[in-house]
Amino acid sequence: MLTRPSSLSTLVMVAMGFCLLPCAGAQIDAFHARFDSVLHQHGIVGGGFAFVHGDSAATQFFFGDAKQDSHKPVDANTSYNWASITKTFTAIAILQLRDRGRLSLDDPAVRYVPELRQVHDAYGSIDDITIRELLTHSAGFRNPTWPWDCDDATNCDWQPFEPTKWSQVAAMLPYTHIAFKPGSRWSYSNLGYVFLGQIIERLSGDDFEVYIDKNILKPLGMTRSYFDRAPYFLEADVSASYLRAGDKLTPQPFNFDTGITTSNSGLKAPIPDMVKYARFLIGDKADPIYDVVLKRSSLEEAWTGVLPAVEPGQKPNSYTSGPGGSQPMMGLGFFVLQVNGHRYIYHDGDQGGFSSELLIDPAGHSAGILAVNTTDTGAPQPATLHPESNTEPDANTDLRQTIRNELIENVFPAYAQQPTAAQTK
């Protein structure tokens, strides 16, 4: 026999309890429909998404084709280039080395990469630029790895776009200058993360890719993740990629090597492997595997905003806004976004037609993971072929912003009150 609740608060709690799972399920179903609609609207050839909540089974759904010419559908094995989300792995590697006593974040970068002494710094000594400033994009280095770009396909015949060797980057350092007083403001720099990759290699004695595999991918069980070109047994699952300009769809080079820029944009992985990464980021603090990869206190340090992640005079875009015009701060390799007093952590990625997002709700133990294989330039003119560029058009800004806002405003709140399996034990 049912008894009457002893108070209104009890009645509300019971009602919430009955609603938690159905309400959350309804929100993810509505999000799935919105996801399909947004990708169709932007002419995306193929993509995938996963939602992770605690240690519950991930919700995954897939859209369109991995390869348009053969109509090979996207599935759980499809591998994407995660582009600048790689920077979060690089930041974790630097923090690992710090926690192991190999470096301090306030060490001068030139101590580990002496070639930087050739850079022109009109604001002081190059010795004043720290590893911390490289992590927070506040060291004053330019964005692209090369100091120039090609403006059309005709002028790009000297590609591949990205340098393949450190010696090519080092040769440009005497012609590189610091653009502003280091530490004074934020300016996104792919080049800075190339230098961080060099620090990891020189301290560990391993190639960057080998270090990340040993210290992050393998411990987390990310067995289908890799750098550079796909190993033979995974080639069939590599997604093609495209630039779209109106009705014109331009295929991008397939299975490309990101060269010396691998530490800022080289990670390739399927959605399920990125689910494993997301579980690490939102995981149970009591699970010993997380301290093996990175102490939770160090991860929280990375998720602490250091300075506004906005260029002077910059208009809001996918990197610099959230719901209600909220503006992010830059942490150590991660962006930190406060929306109505609630903290979200994220990073985007764009390269060679691929576009991606990793969005984390630490307090709610939830994460959203997005990857698509098409960059919608929003331009009516033919798309420029930029095979491996980090400076191609600001890709899929509206798409990512829409997905991010849907998660923050609707999906994450629906799951925030739903206990994880670990919490119910």
Language model region names:
Residues 259-268, 343-378:
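Glycine-rich phosphate/pyrophosphate-binding beta-alpha loops
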Residues 105-121, 218-220:
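Short, glycine/proline-biased beta-turn/loop segments that scaffold the active-site neighborhood
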Residues 65-67, 121-350:
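Short, surface-exposed loop or secondary-structure junction motifs
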Residues 306-319, 370, 375-425:
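Short, gly/Ser/Thr-rich active-site loops of penicillin-recognizing serine hydrolases
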